[in-house]
C-alpha cells in the first residue's frame, strides 16, 4: 500500500481518535502490525496560534514512523499554514478531517459538515496539497449528510481532482454517526469512480471484518478505529 511515495508495508492503518491515539497506544498498535498510525485530530488554527494543547497532540517520536497527523479546519489560510508548520516535524502523511459527525465539531462547519460544500472542500484540499511537498495529503470522508443526501462519489472525485493522494471512506452518513450497519457497497462504487487509493473504514472489529472488507470491496487499505481499542491483536491476527 502506497500513499504517494510513502510505502506503508501493509494495508493496516489505525484511525486518529481523540483522547485515545497517544504515543503508548500508537506504539502498541505498531508492535502488533499496524502499518500507519495517526496522532489525534488537531485544529489547524491551534497549530498556527501555537496553542500548547494543539502542539502537544501531534508530538511523536522517530521510532513511531510512519505516522500521520489529522487536521481539522475550514479555512485555506489556516490549513496551508498548518501544513507548512508541520513540515518541521516531518509527518509521513497529513489528513483533512471531513468525516467527524460530532455536533461540537459540525456546528462550527468542521468535519462532516464540509460534506455539504464540495467546492469549499476542494479549495481546502488544494491549499494543503500546494504547500505539502512530498507529504501525501489524504481526506477522511463519510457517505454524505444523510441517506437521502449521499454524495460520496462527488466528494471523492473532488478530493482526487484537488490533489489528494487517497480518500478514507467511513461507510455511514453524518446523521447516522456510529449507529446502524455500515454500507460497504459504496466502497466498491468509490473504487470504480476514482483512481487514487481508497481506504475503507467503519465497524472493523475483528480480523475477519478486515479480511471481508478487503475481499468484498477491493479497497486498497483499511482504517481501524474502535476495533483497535484494547484489541491490538486485530492487526497481528489479520496478518497471520
State the predicted function of each range:
Residues 1-240:
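Flavin-dependent oxidoreductase catalytic cores
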Amino acid at each position: 500500500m502506497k500513499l504517494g511515495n510513502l510505502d506503508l508495508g501493509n494495508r493496516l492503518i489505525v484511525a486518529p481518535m481523540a483522547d485515545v491515539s497517544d504515543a503508548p497506544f500508537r506504539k502498541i498498535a505498531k508492535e502488533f502490525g499496524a502499518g500507519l498510525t495517526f496522532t489525534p485530530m488537531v485544529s489547524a488554527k491551534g497549530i498556527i496560534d501555537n496553542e500548547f494543547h494543539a502542539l502537544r497532540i501531534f508530538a511523536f517520536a522517530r521510532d513511531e514512523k510512519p505516522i500521520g497527523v489529522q487536521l481539522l479546519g475550514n479555512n485555506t489560510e489556516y490549513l496551508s499554514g498548518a501544513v507548512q508548520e508541520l513540515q518541521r516535524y516531518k509527518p509521513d502523511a497529513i489528513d483533512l478531517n471531513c468525516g467527524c459527525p460530532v455536533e461540537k465539531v459540525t456546528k462550527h462547519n468542521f468535519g462532516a459538515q464540509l460534506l455539504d460544500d464540495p467546492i469549499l472542500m476542494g479549495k481546502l484540499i488544494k491549499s494543503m496539497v500546494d504547500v505539502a511537498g512530498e507529504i501525501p495529503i489524504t481526506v477522511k470522508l463519510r457517505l454524505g449528510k444523510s441517506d437521502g443526501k449521499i454524495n460520496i462519489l462527488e466528494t471523492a472525485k473532488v478530493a482526487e481532482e484537488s490533489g489528494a493522494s487517497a480518500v478514507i471512506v467511513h461507510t455511514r452518513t453524518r446523521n447516522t454517526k456510529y449507529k446502524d450497519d455500515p454500507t460497504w457497497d459504496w466502497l466498491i462504487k468509490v473504487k470504480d469512480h476514482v483512481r487514487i487509493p481508497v481506504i475503507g473504514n467503519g465497524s472493523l472489529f475483528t480480523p475477519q471484518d478486515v479480511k471481508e472488507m478487503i475481499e468484498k470491496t477491493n479497497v486498497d487499505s483499511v482504517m481501524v478505529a474502535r476495533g483497535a481499542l484494547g484489541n491490538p491483536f486485530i492487526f497481528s491476527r489479520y496478518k497471520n
